[in-house]
Swiss-Prot record:
The gene is rpmC. One of its GO terms (biological process) is translation. InterPro entries: Ribosomal_protein_uL29 (IPR050063), Ribosomal_uL29 (IPR001854), Ribosomal_uL29_CS (IPR018254), Ribosomal_uL29_sf (IPR036049). Keywords: Ribonucleoprotein, Ribosomal protein. The keyword Ribonucleoprotein applies. Belongs to the universal ribosomal protein uL29 family. GO terms for cellular component: cytosolic large ribosomal subunit. Pfam families: Ribosomal_L29. This is Large ribosomal subunit protein uL29. One of its GO terms (molecular function) is structural constituent of ribosome.
Length: 64
């Protein structure tokens, strides 16, 4: 997810997306621990998406 796509979302949608990504990251970590994870790059993608969402939320909070 790109930063422009994230800024187009409302705050509630961003928080919901962040929650979804955190759940996905949790599941991916379990898959990695059990050796079932095939696409290991997905871990960093999800972490970066969470960081992007948090960054946009923080920017909006500072602009208010």
């Amino acid at each position: 997810m790109k930063a422009k796509e994230i800024t187009a979302l409302t705050t509630a949608e961003m928080l919901d997306k962040e929650k979804q990504y955190k759940e996905e990251l949790f599941n991916l970590r379990f898959q990695q621990a059990t050796g079932q994870l095939e696409n290991t790059a997905r871990l960093s993608q999800v972490r970066k998406n969470i960081a992007r969402i948090k960054t946009v939320l923080r920017q909006q909070a500072l602009n208010k």
